[in-house]
Curated annotation (Swiss-Prot):
Species of the source: Ovis aries
Keyword GTP-binding: no
Residues with N-acetylmethionine modification: M1
Disulfide bond entries: none
PANTHER family: ALPHA-CRYSTALLIN B CHAIN, HEAT SHOCK PROTEIN HSP-12.2-RELATED
GO molecular function, one term: protein homodimerization activity
Cellular component terms (Gene Ontology): cytoplasm; extracellular region; lysosome; nucleus; protein-containing complex
Protein name as it appears in the record: Alpha-crystallin B chain
Family: Belongs to the small heat shock protein (HSP20) family.
Short name of any one Pfam family annotated for the protein: Crystallin
Localization terms from the record: Cytoplasm; Nucleus; Secreted; Lysosome
Annotated GO biological process: negative regulation of apoptotic process; negative regulation of DNA-templated transcription; protein refolding; response to heat
Binding site for Zn(2+) 2: H104, E106
UniProt xrefs under InterPro entries: A-crystallin/Hsp20_dom, Alpha-crystallin/HSP_16, Alpha-crystallin/sHSP_animal, Alpha-crystallin_N, HSP20-like_chaperone
Length: 175
C-alpha cells in the first residue's frame, strides 16, 4: 500500500490552514501585529513563507533580553522580566554565578491560557565580591543585579626607569 507524504511547504488547496509556519510564529503571551490576524498571502506564490521573527519591528526584540555590563567601577546585569511579578522571581548567588529563576503557573490572558518559566545564569567577574551583589525590579519590568568592582589596592603610581651602564647579558653566546 502506498502512503502519500505531504510536504508542509507545498500548498494544498483543500487544507484550511494555508500557513503551516504560523504556529511557530506565535509569540506566546505577547501582543499581536495586524498582519498576524490575516491569513498568509498565497497570491504571491504557492511557496510563500512568512518573514522571520527577527525582521519584526524593534518593539518586539525587547522581550526576555538581557544585558551584561562591566564598567570601570561596577558590574551589572539587566534582564527583561516584565511578564513576572516580584513574587514569581528568585535571584541567588552560588559561588561566582548569579542564578535567576522565574516561573508563573498557568493563567488566562487575552489570547487564552499561558504559563512561563525561565532560568538564567551569569558569571560574576573575579574582581566583584559575590556578597555585594544586589537586585532590584523597576516599574517597567527590568530586573537589575549589580555589584561594585574591587579597586586596585593603593593608588596608581608611575615607576621611573633607570638606565644602567652594564649589559644585561654578560656571557658571550656559544658557537
Amino acid at each position: 500500500m502506498d502512503i502519500a507524504i505531504h510536504h508542509p511547504w507545498i500548498r494544498r488547496p483543500f487544507f484550511p490552514f494555508h500557513s503551516p509556519s504560523r504556529l511557530f510564529d506565535q509569540f506566546f503571551g505577547e501582543h499581536l501585529l495586524e498582519s498576524d490576524l490575516f491569513p498568509a498571502s498565497t497570491s504571491l506564490s504557492p511557496f510563500y513563507l512568512r518573514p522571520p521573527s527577527f525582521l519584526r519591528a524593534p518593539s518586539w526584540i525587547d522581550t526576555g533580553l538581557s544585558e551584561v555590563r562591566l564598567e570601570k567601577d561596577r558590574f551589572s546585569v539587566n534582564l527583561d522580566v516584565k511578564h513576572f511579578s516580584p513574587e514569581e522571581l528568585k535571584v541567588k548567588v552560588l559561588g561566582d554565578v548569579i542564578e535567576v529563576h522565574g516561573k508563573h503557573e498557568e493563567r488566562q490572558d487575552e489570547h487564552g491560557f499561558i504559563s512561563r518559566e525561565f532560568h538564567r545564569k551569569y558569571r560574576i567577574p573575579a574582581d566583584v565580591d559575590p556578597l555585594t551583589i544586589t537586585s532590584s525590579l523597576s516599574s517597567d519590568g527590568v530586573l537589575t543585579m549589580n555589584g561594585p568592582r574591587k579597586q586596585a589596592s593603593g593608588p596608581e603610581r608611575t615607576i621611573p626607569i633607570t638606565r644602567e651602564e652594564k649589559p644585561a647579558v654578560t656571557a658571550a653566546p656559544k658557537k
